[in-house]
């Protein structure tokens, strides 16, 4: 299984066209894509998440896509299914660094445990809720990657 998270940081690129080209290559190689709402807009010009993801799936033939939308939650697209999960909004958020990476780690944990082909809507909803909760928890403390926590947390 090849996963890809574009993790677009415009300030790190001399030319955004080059970023788009490199991200497109990553998408063309992956089985699992974790992508944020702003990255969907960057790559497709679409502000509608569903339409943007459908464009990416059609163009790159990606079997499993998870879109993160900040306080709007997340969505998974697989086969002909779309599953949504609400965000966990934390009153004591102090640093969002690592939230996307934490979400992606939880996503991959579920896929490795249950397989990419054997996903059903309920399991995917559970996966999104788990990933959203973990991503929310990571924002409540200033921490390093080594302090990310465990499945139990």
Regions found by a protein language model. Give the residues of each.
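Conserved beta-alpha-beta core of the PfkB/ribokinase-like small-molecule kinase fold
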Residues: 1-55, 62-63, 73
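Conserved phosphate-binding/catalytic region of the ribokinase-like
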Residues: 45-153
């Amino acid at each position: 299984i090849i996963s890809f998270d574009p993790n677009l940081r415009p300030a790190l690129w001399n030319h955004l066209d080059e970023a788009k080209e490199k991200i497109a290559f990553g998408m063309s190689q992956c089985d699992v894509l974790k992508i944020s709402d702003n990255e969907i807009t960057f790559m497709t010009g679409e502000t509608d998440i569903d339409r943007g993801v459908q464009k990416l799936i059609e163009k790159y033939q990606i079997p499993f896509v998870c879109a993160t939308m900040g306080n709007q939650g997340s969505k998974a697209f697989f086969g002909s299914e779309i599953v949504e999960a609400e965000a966990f909004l934390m009153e004591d958020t102090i640093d969002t660094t690592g939230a996307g990476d934490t979400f992606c780690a939880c996503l991959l944990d579920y896929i490795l445990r249950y397989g990419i082909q054997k996903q059903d809507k309920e399991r995917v909803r559970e996966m999104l809720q788990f990933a959203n909760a973990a991503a929310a928890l990571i924002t409540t403390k200033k921490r390093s990657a080594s302090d990310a926590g465990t499945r139990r947390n």
